[in-house]
């Protein structure tokens, strides 16, 4: 039992579990020598002693990381507000009443419904006392006085007095039932349907009088108890191998009383993965050997501690799997930098990653290598349970260097956005806001060009009555230049002695040319609305890659004012990307915004 257990970095999901396991054990386990990080061999070593009271460390980690953002944490924050309110004896107004009522609703809902499953675990009479106090709490109204508020606050504080009573197990470990009830929602982002998240099965057992214990015991029974037995087990007759750690496992049998079957664990609880007990037609010769050891099973239970979760279960894990130090440092750096105001600021994510890699590159601490960014978004319902759907981006060496080379222009899009306006009130609908830095980076990571983003940005600028935005024509020109470089990177078009690529100067020349064309066109037509019609027709031709239509519209419009088209448009006939780049540059110039300095440049034909 004293021999250390070794686990190597593997696939992204197991790596997320390993990182979660390290996070849960914390620096104390490293300092004591019970947990060792071996970067050279990409593995960790840990003593079985770390499993003592592991269930408490497990939940304490989540409480520390997310507690303040969840219901019980917010109720405790409200208690601070109550104390300050009493001290300051604030005067009442409608705004204060509405703010307090929101908190009152939260408190009543939590203690009358959400936390009811906890009450049977507490001292006799606890539930009756809490529900009696909760029933007395009423929302405030216009006639409410300071005295009414203080009476309400006294009731809330009385509830919290009950809840904050310390409860310990026989070993002196503190139990945090209310926090755990909230934390279950975070853990559910990573896995579902077993242990303390198998709500229906636990309820049935309790109804039958079976003592399943509290959440701590349920976790230990599910994930730790079998490890202790497995480590003591004589494995000489075991013939199967764990698909992850390659450790020995017993062969599966149809005998339900086989005591060794408890060591055969599956990972179906993590999501839409293969269920070994069903669909044996999916495996060779109808014989399933896809099992993991109890130790690996425990690591997979730590997956939610490896991800960084924000609002509505949006999660992030960076699978920088060169070594454990890099994996741990990069993910924890991202957490501390983007987890602010109780929400993950997604717009900051990639900027932080690139900055960290740039610093590492400068310090020559790590060789730059491909890394995988794993994200969770919506959920998938399977047999009444909700599992995460994962999305993957690869940050290759090629992409990372491209980002470093273009960091100045890319960073100029940070905090740039567009948002649609409400049709009736003309107020921005901020839940629809698109942040350009994130959109641009993700498009590049998916190895796509940026034409659709450029097109959308042009449409936004052309539709002032529908959108609000904070970018201009110069930003669009920068994006066209980034796009040219990105396309040449993707297609390997950089050739010594080959045709010279379009430059930012070419793009700016066309934009400026369009700016002066616009002025002359409006002067000739005496109707500014005509330019809008021209913008939409040109955009349509660009969207459909119709060079002939675009050139017909362009030549006709120039002929109308007696002006020749710019000589650079000859290149539009030879190359689709140059056509779209020059076409959008001209469209941007027609938008009549951006920095007007040096607009004389490019006015020549």
Model-derived regions, located:
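Long, contiguous all-alpha helical interaction modules
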Residues: 1-184, 378-605
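Basic, glycine-/proline-tolerant helical and adjacent loop/strand elements
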Residues: 168-344
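Domain-exit/linker segments immediately C-terminal to small folded modules
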Residues: 260-448, 453
């Amino acid at each position: 039992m004293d021999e250390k257990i070794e686990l190597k970095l593997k696939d992204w999901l197991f790596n997320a579990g390993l990182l979660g396991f390290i996070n849960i054990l914390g620096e104390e386990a490293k300092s004591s020598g019970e947990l060792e990080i071996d970067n050279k061999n990409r593995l960790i070593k840990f003593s079985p002693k770390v499993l003592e009271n592991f269930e408490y460390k497990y939940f304490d980690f989540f409480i520390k990381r997310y507690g303040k953002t969840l219901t019980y944490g917010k109720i405790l924050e409200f208690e601070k507000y109550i104390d300050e309110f009493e001290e300051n004896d604030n005067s009442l107004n409608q705004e204060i009443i509405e703010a307090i009522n929101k908190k009152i609703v939260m408190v009543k809902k939590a203690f009358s419904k959400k936390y009811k499953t906890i009450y049977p675990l507490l001292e006799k009479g606890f539930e009756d006392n809490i529900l009696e106090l909760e029933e007395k709490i009423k929302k405030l109204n216009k006639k409410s006085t300071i005295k009414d508020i203080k009476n309400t606050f006294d009731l809330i504080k009385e509830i919290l007095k009950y809840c904050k009573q310390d409860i310990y197990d026989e070993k002196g470990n503190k139990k945090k039932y209310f926090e755990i009830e909230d934390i279950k929602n975070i853990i559910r982002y990573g896995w579902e349907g077993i242990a303390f998240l198998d709500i229906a099965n636990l309820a049935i057992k309790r109804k039958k009088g079976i003592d399943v214990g509290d959440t701590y015991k349920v976790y230990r029974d599910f994930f730790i108890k079998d490890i202790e037995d497995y480590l003591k087990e004589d494995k000489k007759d075991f013939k199967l191998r764990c698909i992850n750690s390659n450790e020995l496992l017993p062969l599966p049998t149809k005998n339900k009383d086989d005591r060794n079957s408890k060591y055969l664990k599956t990972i179906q609880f993590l999501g839409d993965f293969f269920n070994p007990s069903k669909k044996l037609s999916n495996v060779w010769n109808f014989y399933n050997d896809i099992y993991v050891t109890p130790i690996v099973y425990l690591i997979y239970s730590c997956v939610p501690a490896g991800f960084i979760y924000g609002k509505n279960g949006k999660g992030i894990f960076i699978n920088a799997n060169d070594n454990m130090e890099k994996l741990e440092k990069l993910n924890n750096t991202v957490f501390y930098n983007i987890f602010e105001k109780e929400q993950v600021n997604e717009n900051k994510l990639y900027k932080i990653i690139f900055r960290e890699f740039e610093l590492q590159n400068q310090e020559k601490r790590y060789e730059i290598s491909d890394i995988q960014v794993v994200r969770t978004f919506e959920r998938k319902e399977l047999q009444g349970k909700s599992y995460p759907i994962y999305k993957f981006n690869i940050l290759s060496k090629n992409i990372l260097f491209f980002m470093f080379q273009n960091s100045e222009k890319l960073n100029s899009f940070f905090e740039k956005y567009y948002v649609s306006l409400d049709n009736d009130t003309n107020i921005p609908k901020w839940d629809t806001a698109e942040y350009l830095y994130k959109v641009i980076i993700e498009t590049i990571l998916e190895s796509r060009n940026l034409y659709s983003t450029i097109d959308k940005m042009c449409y936004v600028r052309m539709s002032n009555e529908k959108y609000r935005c904070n970018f201009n024509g110069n930003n669009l020109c920068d994006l066209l230049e980034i796009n040219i470089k990105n396309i040449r990177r993707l297609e390997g078009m950089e050739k010594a002695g080959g045709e010279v690529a379009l430059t930012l100067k070419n793009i700016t020349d066309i934009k400026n040319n369009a700016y002066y064309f616009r002025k002359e066109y409006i002067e000739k037509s005496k109707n500014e609305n005509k330019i809008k019609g021209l913008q939409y027709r040109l955009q349509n031709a660009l969207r459909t890659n119709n060079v002939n239509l675009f050139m017909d519209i362009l030549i006709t419009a120039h002929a109308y004012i007696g002006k020749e088209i710019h000589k650079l448009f000859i290149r539009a006939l030879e190359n689709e990307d140059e056509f779209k780049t020059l076409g959008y540059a001209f469209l941007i110039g027609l938008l009549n915004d951006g920095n007007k300095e040096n607009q004389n440049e490019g006015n020549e034909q």
